């Protein structure tokens, strides 16, 4: 690798680290014709930076030159940083060479917008086409959609990328206009809708046509920056819920704002800590909506617009709804068992299965992986005491926080947990 390429790589890999939407699950692209890589069988090897962010792929910008001046972005037009740009062939060569050395399993490619949205999207499209068609590369490719690019370019990119994503940037339109007046949620939603509609069309065609081309097989995602503006957690989660339902997104990512701008007084001061604990609570809430059957207004609402940072959102909901407990594990349905703090998806399924063979006892719960010290305040089993003193929510909260104090300290470093 030449010194110039090494310098470009250092600049453009560092500039890409603020984009967290690089999860790679969900693709079933198989190796064909003795090509390179296999997103289906080999999987993606994830690694984490010191602040807990996933950097599993060759994660780079095509260029950090940008015509926009978004206040929260390190690559903004007015920022005095070293600029660089790859050529199409340089990105292709880097990807293939790194893959052959077993450094990576795929490519995450984004870019600043240089000249125009179409010009930038064309260059990125050339990269993925060369990898697929000329290099016969079958590894994982995550391609960022450039906002405002023509529908034809976006549709063609979907034929070669495993996953595509486009960032909402801010949870509220007010926040976006404050820090990025040249952008709008409407434009992002238009591009998300293009891919959604194409996926629906191809799904319908598969009913009558045997061979339909793969199109963004791992779906599309988006990302929001949290903590830059005065948005509430209700703003963030309602926006996420809206996009899950309207655009069939696979994931919504939350990125705690890392202060990098000394010139904008409306942004958090440089040197202040990014809101990692808040970011973690948002991910836990996202998990509840996607896997636990919670509606967004059960987690946050007008009365409770922000998440409790001291306890996870599932426990917070349980403490606010004592009328729902205790749950009789020998009679309750699966969805209600899922709502018990300390019981996850796997444990809930095991409990339902175990009931076919006998009553649920406390010892069995521990064997099934239930966090009993947390769950015990919210359940009844066959061998639970017949008469139990009714405990207040504040008492239960304090007991759980006291029991788990050392655990919560550990969660802050380096990778925050999603565990409930």
Regions of interest found by a model, annotated:
Residues 58-60, 89-100, 207-208:
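Short, charged beta->alpha transition segments
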Residues 60-89:
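Canonical Radical SAM [4Fe-4S] cluster-binding loop centered on the CxxxCxxC motif
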Residues 92, 115-299:
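Conserved AdoMet/S-adenosylmethionine-binding subsite of the radical SAM
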Residues 96-112, 285:
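Short Fe-S-cluster ligation motifs
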Residues 1-65, 371, 379, 387-411, ...:
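Flexible, acidic/Gly-rich N-terminal and inter-domain linker regions that tether
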Residues 306-336, 362-420:
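C-terminal extensions
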Residues 57, 70, 109, 166, ...:
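Conserved, mostly hydrophobic/aromatic
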């Amino acid at each position: 690798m030449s010194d110039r390429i090494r310098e470009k790589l250092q600049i453009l890999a560092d500039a890409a680290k603020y984009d967290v939407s690089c999860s790679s699950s969900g693709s079933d692209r198989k190796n064909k014709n003795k090509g390179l890589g296999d997103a289906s069988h080999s999987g993606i090897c994830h690694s984490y930076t010191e602040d807990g962010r996933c950097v599993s792929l060759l994660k780079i910008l095509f260029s950090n030159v940008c015509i926009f001046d978004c206040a929260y972005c390190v690559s903004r037009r007015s920022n005095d940083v070293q600029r660089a740009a790859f050529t199409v062939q340089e990105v292709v060569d880097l990807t293939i060479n790194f893959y052959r050395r077993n450094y990576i399993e795929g490519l995450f490619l984004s870019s600043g917008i240089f000249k125009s949205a179409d010009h930038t999207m064309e260059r990125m499209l050339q990269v993925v086409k060369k990898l697929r068609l000329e290099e016969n590369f079958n590894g994982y490719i995550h391609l960022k959609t450039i906002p405002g690019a023509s529908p034809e370019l976006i549709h063609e990119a979907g034929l070669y990328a495993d996953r595509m994503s486009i960032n909402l940037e801010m949870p509220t339109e007010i926040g976006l206009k404050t820090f990025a007046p040249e952008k709008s949620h409407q434009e992002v939603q238009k591009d998300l809708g293009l891919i959604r509609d194409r996926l629906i069309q191809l799904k319908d065609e598969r009913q009558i046509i045997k061979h339909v081309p793969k199109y963004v097989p791992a779906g599309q995602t988006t990302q929001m920056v949290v903590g830059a503006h005065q948005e509430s957690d209700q703003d963030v989660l309602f926006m996420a819920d809206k996009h899950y339902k309207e655009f069939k997104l696979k994931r919504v990512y939350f990125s705690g704002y890392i202060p990098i701008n000394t010139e904008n007084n409306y942004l958090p001061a440089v040197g202040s800590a990014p809101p990692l604990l808040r970011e973690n609570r948002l991910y836990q809430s996202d998990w509840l909506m996607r896997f636990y059957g919670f509606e967004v207004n059960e987690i946050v609402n007008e009365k409770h617009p922000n998440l409790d940072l001291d306890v996870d959102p599932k426990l917070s909901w349980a403490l606010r709804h004592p009328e729902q407990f205790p749950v009789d594990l020998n009679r309750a349905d699966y969805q209600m068992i899922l709502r018990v703090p300390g019981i996850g998806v796997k444990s809930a399924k095991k409990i339902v299965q175990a009931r076919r063979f006998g009553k649920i006892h406390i010892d069995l719960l521990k064997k099934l992986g239930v966090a009993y010290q947390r769950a015990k305040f919210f359940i009844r089993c066959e061998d639970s005491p017949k008469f139990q003193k009714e405990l207040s929510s504040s008492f239960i909260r304090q007991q759980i926080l006291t029991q788990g104090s050392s655990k919560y300290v550990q969660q802050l470093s380096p990778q925050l947990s999603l565990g409930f």
